[in-house]
Amino acid sequence: MRRKDRENNSPEFFELVFDKAEIINIAFRDEPFPYCLPFNFGKIENKIYIHCAKEGRKLDLIRAHPEVAFNLAIDIRIDREKYTTYFKSVCGTGQASLVEDPAEKAAALDAIGEKYAALCPRPSPMSLLNRVSVIKIAILSLSGKNCEPRED
């Protein structure tokens, strides 16, 4: 990171951003350009979970190239007088895979529902498990950046 004064790689910072972020943007490897999409997500330990339809482009891309990149940002505020934006962000890389184990799939969907306080039954019913795909991203690297107003 070029701006070492803004770097924040503490586990507490990572947890803060993951807890408060409402959306995660995930870039999948495609040709000639990456394919980047926003998702609701859940996190269990060092794994990110998203859900999607049972077929589609992202699943095809994961099967061909499971390496992904992602980013999350919170506390975004534009200061027009100072021509800057304040934020806390985390960028990372990971290895994506399709979750096949019903227990892990249910836990992932429960984590997503819990994060968004969804009014859905928990534990997730088997009928839901059969209707959706769940993707697991095993986190390989994280990098945090914190741009806050300075006390002058």
Language-model regions, residue ranges each:
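Short, intrinsically disordered, mixed-charge
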Residues: 19, 64-68, 110, 114-118
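Short beta-strand segments
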Residues: 21-54, 70
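Active-site-adjacent structural patch at catalytic or cofactor/ligand-binding sites
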Residues: 53-54, 64-77, 86-96
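Anion-coordinating catalytic cores for phosphoryl-, nucleotidyl-, and glycosidic chemistry
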Residues: 5-6, 15, 57-60, 70
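Charged, gly/pro-rich active-site loop segments
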Residues: 1-5, 80-152
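Extreme N-terminal tail/first-helix region
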Residues: 1-20
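Solvent-exposed residues in well-ordered beta-strands and their adjoining turns
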Residues: 44, 53, 73, 97-99, ...
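Short glycine/proline-enriched turns and hinge-like loops at secondary-structure junctions
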Residues: 34-36, 62-63, 83-84
